[in-house]
């Protein structure tokens, strides 16, 4: 059975959004969980249970998580799906290139499943872990539960592209930034109509069904040759998680409006905190104010 976890907003480095790879849906769910772990690490959130662990190593990190974390409301008899996904992912790599760098790296190694507990452990190579933590190229924000629902890896990748997108987005078919190379589909779906039917239409169908974000694709041509598509964002507001909407709304409100006057003034005038310092730590301060009597 799949693991039931509360929904959360995940911030994915644009390096991962634009990386070139060809993963199965199960392999992609391992990556989603890896990115979730990286976000917790970055936020300094301690994982307190024995089923989820991040342990630094000399050349990366060791991850522990339940096998159920990568399943989609399904049973996995004798861990067949999980074993296949971990084995396949350990033989694959990811490629990234921009105007300054190019790199290719293996992703994970030494996957292990404890059959009695259903706990998986694996090692993540350092460049992969650093890429998950690197937001210097920008990022995409998406809902983890929504991302885990998709059956098609193309739906997953288009969801990452379109999540939060408010303006039309041109995606070329060919070239180093093209969909064919980004999805590692060289030699497949050579006819444009086949590519659209097998990749874009499949992704759109799932996004239209499950996602708050979808798109309408307009074919773009140079002469008679199709060079790509402009994706016009479609937003289904009723599908967005209300709790995450509220979190986003609160995040925009300054600490001055959320902290009690005596708490805010005490921090500012007794400890000489600047307003931006209080804002950076407002989540912790608000929790303390709400939970601890006579907080200050």
Predicted regions located by residue number:
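Charged, alpha-helix-forming regions
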Residues: 1-295
């Amino acid at each position: 059975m799949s693991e039931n976890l509360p929904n959360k907003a995940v911030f994915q480095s644009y390096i991962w959004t634009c990386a070139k790879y060809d993963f199965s849906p199960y392999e992609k769910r391992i990556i989603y969980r890896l990115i979730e772990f990286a976000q917790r690490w970055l936020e300094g959130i301690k994982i307190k249970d024995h089923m989820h662990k991040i342990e630094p190593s000399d050349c990366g990190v060791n991850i522990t998580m339940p096998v159920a974390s990568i399943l989609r409301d399904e049973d996995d008899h004798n861990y067949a799906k999980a074993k296949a996904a971990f084995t396949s992912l350990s033989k694959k790599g990811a490629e990234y290139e921009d105007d300054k760098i190019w790199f290719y790296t293996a992703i994970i190694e030494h996957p292990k499943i404890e059959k009695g507990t259903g706990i998986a452990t694996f090692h993540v190579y350092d460049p992969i872990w650093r890429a998950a933590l690197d937001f210097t190229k920008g990022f995409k924000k998406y809902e983890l539960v929504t991302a885990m629902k998709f059956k098609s890896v193309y739906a997953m990748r288009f969801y990452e592209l379109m999540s939060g997108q408010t303006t039309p987005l041109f995606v070329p078919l060919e070239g180093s930034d093209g969909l064919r190379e980004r999805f590692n589909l060289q030699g497949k779906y050579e006819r444009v109509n086949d590519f659209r039917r097998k990749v874009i239409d499949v992704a759109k169908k799932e996004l239209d069904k499950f996602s708050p974000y979808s798109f309408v694709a307009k074919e773009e041509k140079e002469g008679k040759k199709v060079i790509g598509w402009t994706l016009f964002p479609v937003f289904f507001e009723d599908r967005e998680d209300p709790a995450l909407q509220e979190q986003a709304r609160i995040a925009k409100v300054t600490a001055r409006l959320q902290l009690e006057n005596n708490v805010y003034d005490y921090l500012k005038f007794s400890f000489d905190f600047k307003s931006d310092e209080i804002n950076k730590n407002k989540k912790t301060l608000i929790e303390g104010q709400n939970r601890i009597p006579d907080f200050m």
